[in-house]
Amino acid sequence: MKNLLLMTLLVLSSFSISAKQILLGPNSNSQEEIQEALIDLEPGDVLTLEPGEYFFEDGISLDVDDVIFEGSGIDDTILHFGDQVSGAQGLLVTSDGVTLRDFAVLDAKGDAIKVIGADGISMIRLRTEWTGGPKETNGAYGFYPVESKDVLIDGCVAIGASDAGIYVGQSQNIIVKNSIAQYNVAGIEIENSYYADVFDNLASHNTGGILVFDLPDLPQQGGHHVRVFRNKAINNDTDNFAPEGNIVGEVPRGTGIIIQANSDVEVFDNDIYGNGTVNLSIVTYGYETDDENYNPHPKSIQIHNNRFGDGGFDPDVGTGELAAILFELSGGDMPDIFWDGILPMNQILFGQPDDEKLVISNNGDATFLTLNPIKYLLPFFDPVERDIKEYEGQVRPLPEVILN
């Protein structure tokens, strides 16, 4: 036992002795110095940037496991990419166990911070921003971890992305918390991902506040087990400025939360108001696809104990189809919660399994609208249903996400 303890202490001691802390300040050669330092890091090292402004003409990248890359504060260490001429990202991370914290990435040519294939990535107190306001020439994503596991985004700020400010795609075990997303097309988006907790965030002045999407033709699909709670999805009022062809280009201005084609999603204890088209929508993926493995229908969605306020007062009927269809169906009396009512044909005929049914419970005076698909297909019937009480049911809380 003593020998084992001694060996452990020796290993820890050698690790701490070999780990380095590198401190760099701004100068005319910052691009080369920082990239060289990122290449030369070894596991356990910490690279710290002093307060100041750092200017880049190329993207920078990190491919070393178990390191920390940090600045001296979200408003104090500023990485400027406004003159970037090469690289699809400001910062690209392709390694495991990395922590990024306490700096800002401004005006990247493409995505601000992209992480690919990481087993453990922590982004803490970071800011990504395009400083010229909402424009389709802005980069697509602020925070962009994809194909990763154990993703933490905590205390971050995302402003001005032409797709999503905070986006996590094709990943699993995800926490997005204590963050602010403003003036993006999508504020926060969880796409084709498994086990995500999104909580204590502010999503405001975006086109759409919080999106939980699942799309076809991707290696990982069938998004499931997403909890959205204690957020403020409020006052999302920015015109859609996504480049033509982007899926989020269909999101109407004034959308609080959209759930599309996911299963096992729990939305609770949120403040949702000030969204001019609709506060919350649950919709089927509406495009044809040749992907035989893809299920376009949302199921096992639970909406409970939220606080809804004014919504639907300025529907964006000119963007996509959602707002125009909803406006027509509702006669202009837009609901707080909308479900398109579309089900697989066998469920239209024989009913949904109980554990897949939509549950809406304890949302105050929230209003509701859905379609009866059979009545919608037949003439002389009103397909619109508004009785929210029919969807009261037993809430089955989803498990908390715990990162490894």
Q: Residue spans of the language-model regions?
A:
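Acidic, glycine- and Ser/Thr-rich low-complexity intrinsically disordered tracts
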Residues: 288, 293-404
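Right-handed parallel beta-helix
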Residues: 70-75, 96-107, 119-132, 149-162, ...
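Sec-dependent signal peptide recognition
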Residues: 2-8
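Hydrophobic h-region of N-terminal signal peptides that target proteins for export
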Residues: 9-18
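Short, T/G/N/S-enriched strand-turn elements that build extracellular solenoid repeat scaffolds
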Residues: 32-40, 55-64, 69, 114-117, ...
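Extracellular beta-strand/beta-solenoid scaffold signature
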Residues: 31-34, 57, 81-91, 107-114, ...
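Right-handed parallel beta-helix/beta-spiral solenoid domain characteristic of secreted/periplasmic
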Residues: 20-32, 46, 66-109, 132
